[in-house]
């Protein structure tokens, strides 16, 4: 048993969708989360800069003595996960492989769509993973650069959100039966995305799928938290306004949290 926390990182608040699923599936585990809101979104940035920012968050989490790191950001996973995984001596998970695997299991038509940030789509990481596992699966990718700013500005239920999602996703409607939400911000827009795509399209939340892998690794390495040892509580950090982060986080997680601002 291991009472150390699990570290989560993201470019902003999107990774909270993974944390929410973590609270549901593994409530005994302690979470330390950092969101780099001051520099979000990561999607339009060059790969080297994304790699640098991701390492800064990783190094911050390491100072908190975490037992595992979850890169709860598709863009950072696509650019930096492999390198970080190879250099650290604790488990490091990304969100792309779990989402790709779930999509393959879900599709009946063999037609899968991926929506993500420009960098995630440019990296081609999802398509490569899917076609390595299932070569006959047809994959179409679409960058959605306007989605993250809508979530980060807490406009998920606005008429603007509905308009942007409809206009962005229209080219995909009727062309697939499974759609990967290839950015951890996107589940916060899930009701609108589902409405645009149609009830028959299965939406894959890569973050939720990742939590299943977290559970497997905790058991494999025997580093689960013991229910009998009460943990020190969850800790949330942002590089921007704690007030803005707290508002979105409490709304999404349905619980009060404490948020600290840090400078990386």
Swiss-Prot record:
Listed Pfam families: Asp_Glu_race (PF01177)
GO terms for biological process, alphabetical: cell wall organization; peptidoglycan biosynthetic process; regulation of cell shape
Pathway(s) it belongs to: Cell wall biogenesis; peptidoglycan biosynthesis
Catalytic activity, EC: 5.1.1.3
Catalytic site: 73, 183
Domain of life of the source: Bacteria
HAMAP family linked to this entry: Glu_racemase
Described purpose of this protein according to its UniProt entry: Provides the (R)-glutamate required for cell wall biosynthesis.
Protein name per the record: Glutamate racemase
Gene designation per UniProt: murI
């Amino acid at each position: 048993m291991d009472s150390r926390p699990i570290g989560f990182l993201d470019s902003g608040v999107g990774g909270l969708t993974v944390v929410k699923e973590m609270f549901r599936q593994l409530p005994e585990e302690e979470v330390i989360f950092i969101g780099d809101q001051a520099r979000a979104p990561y999607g339009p940035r060059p790969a080297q800069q994304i790699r640098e920012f991701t390492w800064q968050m990783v190094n911050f989490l390491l100072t908190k003595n975490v037992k595992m790191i979850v890169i709860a950001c598709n863009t950072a996973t696509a650019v930096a996960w492999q390198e970080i995984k190879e250099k650290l001596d604790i488990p490091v998970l990304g969100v792309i492989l779990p989402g790709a695997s779930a999509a393959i299991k879900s599709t009946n038509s063999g037609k899968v769509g991926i929506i993500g940030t420009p960098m995630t789509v440019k990296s081609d990481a999802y398509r490569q993973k899917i076609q390595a596992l299932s070569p006959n699966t047809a994959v179409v990718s679409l960058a959605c650069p306007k989605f993250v700013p809508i979530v980060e500005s807490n406009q998920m239920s606005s008429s603007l959100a509905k308009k942007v999602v409809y206009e962005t996703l229209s080219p995909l409607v009727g062309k697939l039966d499974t759609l990967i939400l290839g950015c951890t911000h996107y589940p916060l827009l899930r009701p609108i995305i589902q409405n645009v795509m149609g009830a028959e399209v299965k939406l894959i939340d890569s973050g939720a799928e990742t939590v299943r892998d977290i559970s497997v690794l905790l058991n494999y390495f025997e580093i689960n938290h013991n229910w009998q040892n009460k943990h020190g509580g969850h800790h949330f950090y942002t590089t921007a306004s704690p007030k803005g982060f707290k508002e979105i986080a409490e709304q999404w997680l349905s619980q009060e949290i404490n948020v600290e601002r840090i400078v990386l």
